[in-house]
Each structure stands twice: as structure tokens, then as C-alpha cells.
Amino acid sequence: MQQLVEQLNAQIPLEGYLTVAAIMFAIGAWGALIRRNAVVVFMCVELMINAVNLTLVAFADFLPGAGGAGAGYTVLIIAIAAAEVAVGLAIVLAIFRTRRTVNIDEVDSLRG
């Protein structure tokens, strides 16, 4: 397994991983700023979080002495993101039940 990882590292440099992560983050940020549907905005935020996870794992893999710390932090971030999505989608569902819309522009008041 270690030999396979070393072969992949020889083929794909750190800049390749960082470029993919930057593109993922940019797409997520663009979608979160442009789209008005709350569910799509949540998906874009998750894409941004996964771009950060990719960066963290790439640096942990390429830096000597990092060990499995990058993967450990990534698992923690994924667990926190799952909880964030559960709470966020519950809020969106509650808003949809009262307002009959998930459009962010139409839900601008905190009153019921």
C-alpha cells in the first residue's frame, strides 16, 4: 500500500492536488454566492469543506513527519460537517413548512 501511495505521489505533485482543491473551493464559493436555493447553498458549502479536506490530506501526505494526522483531522471535519448538514436541513425543512419556499431571498425575516 505504501508503495502505491509513493507511486501516486511521484505521478501527481502537490500542486495538482492544490489546484483541484482550489477549483473545488471556487466552484463552491461561486455556487453559495449565486444560487438562491437553500439546499443548493448547503451543497456548495459542503463542496468547499471537502476542498479544504483535500488540501489537508494532501499536505499531510507530502510533508514529512505528519503521519496520519491529516486523515484524522479530515475524519473529524467530515463528522462535524455531517452534523452541520443535519441541523441545516432541519432548519430548511422547518422554513419550508411555514413559508412554502426555500428561496433565500424570500426568507428574510426571523418572525414566524
From Swiss-Prot:
Molecular function GO labels: NADH:ubiquinone reductase (non-electrogenic) activity; quinone binding
Protein localization: Cell membrane
InterPro entries named in the record: NADH_UbQ_OxRdtase_chain4L/K, NUOK/Mnh_C1-like
Keyword Ubl conjugation: no
GO terms (BP aspect): ATP synthesis coupled electron transport
One annotated Gene Ontology cellular component of this protein: plasma membrane
Catalytic activity as recorded in UniProt: a quinone + NADH + 5 H(+)(in) = a quinol + NAD(+) + 4 H(+)(out)
Parts of the chain that traverse the membrane: 14-34, 39-59, 76-96
Swiss-Prot/TrEMBL keywords: Cell membrane, Membrane, NAD, Quinone, Translocase, Transmembrane, Transmembrane helix, Transport
Subunit comment: NDH-1 is composed of 14 different subunits. Subunits NuoA, H, J, K, L, M, N constitute the membrane sector of the complex.
Job description of the protein: NDH-1 shuttles electrons from NADH, via FMN and iron-sulfur (Fe-S) centers, to quinones in the respiratory chain. The immediate electron acceptor for the enzyme in this species is believed to be a menaquinone. Couples the redox reaction to proton translocation (for every two electrons transferred, four hydrogen ions are translocated across the cytoplasmic membrane), and thus conserves the redox energy in a proton gradient.
HAMAP family membership: NDH1_NuoK
PANTHER family: NADH-UBIQUINONE OXIDOREDUCTASE CHAIN 4L (PTHR11434:SF16), NADH-UBIQUINONE OXIDOREDUCTASE SUBUNIT ND4L (PTHR11434)
The protein's name in its UniProt record: NADH-quinone oxidoreductase subunit K
Species name: Rubrobacter xylanophilus (strain DSM 9941 / JCM 11954 / NBRC 16129 / PRD-1)
